Amino acid sequence: MELLILKANAITTILTAVTFCFASGQNITEEFYQSTCSAVSKGYLSALRTGWYTSVITIELSNIKENKCNGTDAKVKLIKQELDKYKNAVTELQLLMQSTPPTNNRARRELPRFMNYTLNNAKKTNVTLSKKRKRRFLGFLLGVGSAIASGVAVSKVLHLEGEVNKIKSALLSTNKAVVSLSNGVSVLTSKVLDLKNYIDKQLLPIVNKQSCSISNIETVIEFQQKNNRLLEITREFSVNAGVTTPVSTYMLTNSELLSLINDMPITNDQKKLMSNNVQIVRQQSYSIMSIIKEEVLAYVVQLPLYGVIDTPCWKLHTSPLCTTNTKEGSNICLTRTDRGWYCDNAGSVSFFPQAETCKVQSNRVFCDTMNSLTLPSEINLCNVDIFNPKYDCKIMTSKTDVSSSVITSLGAIVSCYGKTKCTASNKNRGIIKTFSNGCDYVSNKGMDTVSVGNTLYYVNKQEGKSLYVKGEPIINFYDPLVFPSDEFDASISQVNEKINQSLAFIRKSDELLHNVNAGKSTTNIMITTIIIVIIVILLSLIAVGLLLYCKARSTPVTLSKDQLSGINNIAFSN
């Protein structure tokens, strides 16, 4: 029974994953750099998606024209209910096919040939529903971007004349075949469910008998289980507007997925990697509704191709690094902005700035190169020497010292500033460490939570070795007066250049001010000198005048003898 098979596959997958987890081992190490308030988690191995593998999955359907049975037996009623669900599901898929972008006009014209099912709703309602689905589908496509481009391309080809019949013919005597499509692409096609033969040859002959009786309940249960897969596939496509991710076990059971992986044109190491991590593979895969035609439902499954595996990967964690002046509002902050996942890739480094897009299983990192940037290997120098001349390390600046914590693989970075209380606690012993102002690090050994103000952080319990690399916080090297604030996408050289510009401006201002002051001093000296000279001259003139005056006053008047005799005195001359 298929439900039991699904459960068995799920259990097998879990056991395989657990076995792989223990077999792979944990060699994770972590280094915290006090100088830059950052930590690097090492010891991971890569699994980078570099391409897509597309396969066509088919389900053969039955064209149920009528149900003659009108019996009242409980088992017959259950069968009739399942048949109604089946017909409604097929109708839903027909409507969905009309509203998806890959459908062309020819396929739409040929749609009525397939089955005679119609919804009980009016035609106007169907048109409205179709328009809503189309808008939703287009919105979803904008969300996934170009990720499903290859799958959509294959889906479009299936709408061409004769493509479905070509696939149907190839799967007549087998459940798996390679089919060459009209665009020259060969795809692996698989028939995962044959409802047509089951309904036409086993079920309908029973329920359409004159007696309308079913001898055992197993027939009902078997049809419910087979029908359930179609109903779930229909529901997923309907809810997700024709494109679903991850790929569920209804789209592909675990055994079908493992079989498909085994048929992929990849190395044995790649097959082993995918087989041991089927849940991650499902999360990074897509199923795309294609066509329902010629009594066949066809949809495309798009699986990731991991072209780069087993290269070293590491994750960079960063937190704000600020000065710790007691005066509020006088601090400056610097934060590294190059946090994310890094993996070696063909002599360079693939950088994934959005770390959450990568999936981690044990020490394996699954990332999509579509979300990556290619950087030189010198990027590693930023961890040990942020001022290195070979690579310009990325930072951001601010003057807001906000306290926070960043949970790393093996501990936590704590940025504690101002009057915020920051502590690390053990669930049994309580607070085991109180952080002082600044940036600090604590490993997860013997520690369960970190508290920053009113925010509580739970640390990871991954095992590994932590190393604390001490160093002078680089923020202390900068002068708050010339430190540029609110640089959100800058580098060390750009910040230093702005600081140098500020210093040059200050020096120029000082020179101008000095020159102005020097000019003023010279003028003042000249004026003072002139005034002093004038005063000296005036004083000299006054002194000479006084001297002459005094000299004149001190000289006696002497009369001659004639003047004294009066003979020649003018007063007596007449």
Curated annotation (Swiss-Prot):
Question: Per the record, GO CC terms?
Answer: host cell Golgi membrane; host cell plasma membrane; plasma membrane; viral envelope; virion membrane
Q: Altering C382S: what's the impact?
A: No effect on F1 and F2 structure and glycosylation
Region feature Fusion peptide, mapped onto this chain: 137-157
Attached carbohydrates are found at N27, N70, N116, N120, N126, N500
**Keywords (A to Z) from UniProt:** Cleavage on pair of basic residues, Coiled coil, Disulfide bond, Fusion of virus membrane with host cell membrane, Fusion of virus membrane with host membrane, Glycoprotein, Host cell membrane, Host Golgi apparatus, Host membrane, Host-virus interaction, Lipoprotein, Membrane, Palmitate, Signal, Syncytium formation induced by viral infection, Transmembrane, Transmembrane helix, Viral attachment to host cell, Viral attachment to host entry receptor, Viral envelope protein, Viral penetration into host cytoplasm, Virion, Virus entry into host cell
Give GO terms for biological process: entry receptor-mediated virion attachment to host cell; fusion of virus membrane with host plasma membrane; symbiont entry into host cell; symbiont-mediated induction of syncytium formation
Sites of S-palmitoyl cysteine lipidation:
C550
Q: What is this protein called?
A: Fusion glycoprotein F0
**Organism, per UniProt?**
Human respiratory syncytial virus A (strain A2)
Q: Which gene encodes it?
A: F
